[in-house]
Amino acid sequence: MPYIIEVVQAGRTVEVMKYYSSRYGKKGIKRGERKALTKEEQIKVNKRAAEKKLRRLINENFQEGDTHLVLDYRKERRPAGRKEMREDADDFLREMRKLYKRHGIPLKYIHVMEIGKKGALHHHLVINTPEEISQQAIVRCWKGRGRTHHNPLDDTGQYAKLASYLIKQSDGMLRSPDALQGKRWNSSRNLRKPKVLRKEPVKDKGWYNRIARLPKKLEQSYYLDGDSVQEGIHEKTGYTFFTYTFIKNNQTWKETELEWEKL
């Protein structure tokens, strides 16, 4: 039966997803029971989609040497709620834009606010941090509200664990009484979007291939992220899906999109 293949490039990563859909002839393909989702199941589906979107956004726009920045508060400077936290973040980002502008560099960021179960308040940001921008200068932009924790991104180009962590930290914001439309993060407008290399139905007489494999010409330029391989049944459609990610290790190789047609 036909299945859908989706191939998305985000920075050094290429994500592959294969799944069945009722739009493309389900005869002969067994699926789980399709039913209305409970509130908890819908939250799980939405959370997984948000994590995928955030992972791709980080992978596309940030790299080794950039920073996962955490801002916390002194006890006497703690804001009363989400609105005040947002105002503090806006002020910090204004100061950061001024700082970067002085060096002729655009600021790129993703911002997540955290309200912990015990009331802890933090701001998480993923920011570009070129050599011209010092940690001390960033600290000054926070204006003594609390500490700043600087965590440099590694050289893998795959920041799935960071995206998962940030989505988890954003859960508290959705529980906040003044949460707006379940929005988990804000970002600068200058971020690039991941590139969809393929998204189309594939004619096949049986099940899709459950092997995460590369086109032969790309075997020396990419490697499989073993942690990314997942197979399951989508809660909403009842159909199976299979997904995995390759990471580029040869920065000089310039593949063409046609080579991804061979998956």
Model-derived regions, located:
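Right-hand nucleic-acid polymerase module
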Residues: 1-119, 129-263
